[in-house]
Amino acid sequence: MALSVSAASARVQSLVPQQSLRGLKIGMLANQVRAVAGNPSSNRITSHPIMGKTRVMKFGRVQVTFRGTGKAATVVNLSTTSRNERTGSGIGVGSSESALAAKLKGERCVTELGYRHCYLGKWKPGSVVTDFSISKSGRVTRITLGLVID
């Protein structure tokens, strides 16, 4: 018996809005991130205006930000500019805002101070938001899953 798999059904869902990006999740520890993603291409300590010192790991075009720098520091932000990270319905960097609206349920699209974005979730401390940055040409340029801090 021959098995045929279409390209659409073979697509790996590497982005699950409100949940994960490439298997990485908000709240993970650095050792858990490395177990899923391997060694980062970049690993640095930066200063954040609200959180103080943070650790930022990069895995190609995926950036992982931790609240704090020690072993107990947890992931608070996952961001990508890679066209490879897609939802099960194919939404990702490069998708049009109209495609995002058609395939993503519950999103809200707004322009704030000249910044156009569509998001899922509530901007309430402790909540997770999935944010899709939209370019002036109406395409997704960055996708971020983040824990709302304040």
For the regions a language model picked out, list residue spans one by one:
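Second-shell loop/turn segments in exported
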Residues: P17-L24, N84-I91
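Intrinsic-disorder/low-complexity peptide segments enriched for small residues
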Residues: M1, Q19-R22, A102
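Cleaved targeting-peptide boundary
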Residues: A8-V16
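Peripheral interaction segments used for macromolecular assembly
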Residues: Q13, G52-T54, S89
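Secretory targeting and sorting signals
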Residues: M1-S9
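A small/polar (G/S/T-enriched), proline-flanked helix-loop surface module common
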Residues: K71, N77-E85, E97
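A cross-family detector of function-defining hotspots
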Residues: M28-G70, V93-R142, L147-D150
